[in-house]
Amino acid sequence: MTFTVLVSVRAKRDFNRLIVWLVERDPRAAARLGPLLEAALDSLTEAPSRGRSVGPTTREISIPFGQSAYVIRYRLLGSSVHVTRIWHGLEQR
């Protein structure tokens, strides 16, 4: 079964914020991060249940990058994956 991935406005803002922050510090790393996160989002169409459960319908995947990782949190609702947030693993949350 193929799932539809829907990215919330807030998650899109998270994505852009993370890229802008990294571009200011390391443009080459930022050029790698964008496609990496996009590939992770695309992978949810085929295997959304691979993320760890953090609630009844909420899951998250960790995407290694450098010495840390980025986190994508999402909800499974029927045949849809609703991405709610994206953040760097070292962010104060």
Curated annotation (Swiss-Prot):
Superkingdom in the source lineage: Bacteria
Q: Phenotype when inactivated?
A: No visible phenotype when deleted singly or as the relBE1 operon.
Q: Which organism is it from?
A: Caulobacter vibrioides (strain ATCC 19089 / CIP 103742 / CB 15)
Q: List the disulfide bonds.
A: none
* Entries under Pfam families matching the protein: ParE_toxin
What's the protein called, per UniProt? Toxin RelE1
Presence of the UniProt keyword Signal in the record = no
Q: Is the keyword Secreted in the record?
A: no
Q: What does this protein do?
A: Toxic component of a type II toxin-antitoxin (TA) system. Its toxic effect is neutralized by coexpression with cognate antitoxin RelB1 but no other ParD or RelB antitoxin.
Record keywords, A-Z: Toxin-antitoxin system
Family assignment? Belongs to the RelE toxin family.
